[in-house]
A protein has these predicted regions:
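A short, aliphatic-rich alpha-helical micro-motif
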Residues: 2-4, 28-31, 82-83
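Rossmann-like NAD(P)-binding element
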Residues: 2-22, 39
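Short amphipathic alpha-helical segments, especially helix-boundary/capping motifs
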Residues: 11, 25-28, 86-90
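Short, well-ordered turn and helix-capping elements at secondary-structure junctions
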Residues: 15-17, 27, 42, 94
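Rossmann-fold NAD(P) dinucleotide-binding segment
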Residues: 18-37, 48-52
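Rossmann-like dinucleotide-binding domain for NAD(H)/NADP(H)
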Residues: 34, 40-121
């Protein structure tokens, strides 16, 4: 019922046996509205071929993602055919790469290395 009533479906779940291809031909068919689907979780949660068909058939309003089933994306991934589509946005999966996030990463790493040296030195 949620899929049938949703205007936006935003995916934020881990990829596991239960979530692999959670968005697939069958779940897309249950969507009565033309939702916008956003995948910032893992690429394998969306069946690439089913999603490509849904975009091309105007079954969904659009798709935005920063993840793919295989990373880096493979040449045979159906989503590549959508790279210039006006209702599709792909962006790099690099939210962790901001200056602030990198500084935090280096601080944590430095503390862990220092703690290791202190314990073993």
């Amino acid at each position: 019922e949620v899929l049938a009533r949703s205007d936006v479906i935003s995916l934020h779940c881990p990829l596991n046996e239960d979530t692999k291809h959670l968005i697939n031909k069958d779940t897309l068919a249950k969507m009565q509205k033309q939702p916008l689907i956003v995948n910032v979780a893992r690429g394998g949660i969306v069946d690439s071929q089913a999603l490509t068909n849904a975009v091309n058939n105007e079954q969904i309003l659009g798709y935005a993602s920063d993840v793919f089933e295989a990373e880096p994306i493979t040449e045979d991934d159906p989503l590549l055919s959508l790279k210039d589509h006006p209702r599709v946005i792909f962006s790099p999966h690099n939210a962790w790469g901001s200056e602030s996030a990198q500084l935090t990463l280096w601080r944590i790493l430095s503390k862990q290395v220092s703690a290791f040296i202190d314990k073993t030195g």
